[in-house]
Amino acid sequence: MPDNHLYIIPFFSFFLSIIIILLGKKFFKNRALISKGIPIVGGLSIGLPCFLAGVLVLYFSGCLAKELTGILTSSLLMFIFGVIDDRYELSVKAKIATQAAAICLLILQGVQTRIVYIGDIPNIVITFIWIIGITNAFNHLDIMDGLAGLVAFVANLAFFITGYVNGNMLVIVLTLALGGALISFLVFNFPPAKIYMGNSGSHFLGFVLASMALVNSYAPLERPLALLTPLFILGLPILDTCFLIIIRIRQKRSPFKKSDDHLAIRFLKSGYSKKKILLIMFLITAVFSLLGLVLSRVLNPSALLLVLIIIFIGVSIIRKTNSVGNCG
């Protein structure tokens, strides 16, 4: 596909997503895939347009075939497992097993971390931990209307910028496809939500964004700090999940069970409206993403001090909301 035709991708993804949502709202009414009377069609409206947009790119251009095929097929598998989970509520072990299967398929097609300082086996292990962590982080983040989709959109935009700056056509294609679908989804998912994302959507989002981070270009040898770029772009879901796990372990509860320990829920308990919480989460994600983009370009290792300061601020905010939530 010629570069000057890339603008077609987000429009294709957007309008196909709109069609799927409108048809899905009608089709899933009074059927199994509903929650509180609201259809769980968000995953389909994000996953299918992204997949078909990728297939179109493969049809018109063979230069991205290997890695794009790997991400498309493995993310489709993750989406299918998510639909099954939405319908039958898989056990934790079954979820981890299905996610591992999708990750294996991805790695077998050549998509993994390629950190030059370590060998192949450590890179594969890091890939597993990274993708399974981000996939479940977005699943945990899907606790409020518009939240997971909004955070994903900001992170996707940041990945688009890194891909554009580095001339990474694969990342550009993926972010354009995902961005178009996310815009249409958010129109129907902002509070009060008319559709839900479901596990199929949150797992797909986390998986694609995590995979996108792997195929992006960050760190030539002269810019080692750029390795932190994807960690910052996805900083909010990572931090939220890490603190969630720490809190639950301290309270001797399973990290995998649903609870109200999330940062967004604590803001809600403190009296913030849902729209104000979304604004706060948007700003946090935007700041983290901006820092990630800055780190991808700096040469001076002293910039690590900036990283530590931001981490300290983020930790302080979460601890403060944690104490406020406990008092409420």
Language-model features, listed with the residues they occupy:
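Small-residue-rich transmembrane alpha-helices that serve as helix-helix interface/gating elements
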Residues: 300-316
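Membrane-interface capping segments at transmembrane-helix boundaries
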Residues: 25-27, 190, 249, 316-328
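A helix-boundary/kink motif common to multi-pass secondary transporters
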Residues: 91, 142, 272-273, 300
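A short, structure-level motif marking secondary-structure boundaries and short turns
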Residues: 9-11, 87, 119, 248-250, ...
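Extended hydrophobic-aromatic, low-complexity segments
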Residues: 222-224, 245, 256-258, 276, ...
